């Protein structure tokens, strides 16, 4: 059993992990961006440390800051929650190199399944039925062409997304055109990966 676990996340998932850790008699360590100082996950934790000001990339996704806090405060495990660094194999390897347990999948499992487009390719190779879709798309015009071939509505998806973040239903070419930059930007800010692809969307499936 661990003695002290850092929760590398915020919001509802961080409060749920904190509640479970307290039930198990394990100290919960919260981290927070300055803008989240008054958040519930901060006040509920046994210890809480500020990651500074700035975007998610500068705070919750800043591995150097997180590792420094873990080592400084004697953390022996980290729970990533969902989103953020939860599917980042480099973060897991960094934890392992420092003797800090990562509560989650291995780097190898993440490399295989952490990116939706690679998981989709693996599923195709093994004969799993899938909705029509694309590989990674880097060009908006290619995305618009692919969507026309697949047929609207489609879902524009972040390959690295998690927790429902980085998905946008596009009913037509205009909505896909508008969603393209925003979904990629959201993905880059939350997952440090702006890769996107398209799948056919089935309403009320």
Model-found features: residue ranges?
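N-terminal beta-alpha lobe that positions the nucleotide/phosphoryl donor
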Residues: 1-205
């Amino acid at each position: 059993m661990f003695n002290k676990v850092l929760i590398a996340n915020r919001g509802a998932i961080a409060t749920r992990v904190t509640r479970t850790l307290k039930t198990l008699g394990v100290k919960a360590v919260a981290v927070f961006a300055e803008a989240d100082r008054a958040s519930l996950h901060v006040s509920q934790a046994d210890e809480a440390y500020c990651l500074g000001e700035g975007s998610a990339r500068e705070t919750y996704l800043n591995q150097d800051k997180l590792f420094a806090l873990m080592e400084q405060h004697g953390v022996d495990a980290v729970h990533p929650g969902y989103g953020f660094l939860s599917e980042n194999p480099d973060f897991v390897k960094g934890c392992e190199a420092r003797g800090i347990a990562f509560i989650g999948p291995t780097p190898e499992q993440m490399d295989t399944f952490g990116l939706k487009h690679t998981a989709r390719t693996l599923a195709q190779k093994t004969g799993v039925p899938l909705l029509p879709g694309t590989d990674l798309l880097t060009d908006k015009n290619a995305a618009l062409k692919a969507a026309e071939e697949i047929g609207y509505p489609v879902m524009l998806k972040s390959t690295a997304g998690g927790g429902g973040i980085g998905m946008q239903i596009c009913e037509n070419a205009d909505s896909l055109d508008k969603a393209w930059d925003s979904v990629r930007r959201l993905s880059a800010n939350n997952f440090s990966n702006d890769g996107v692809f398209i799948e056919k969307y089935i309403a009320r499936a």
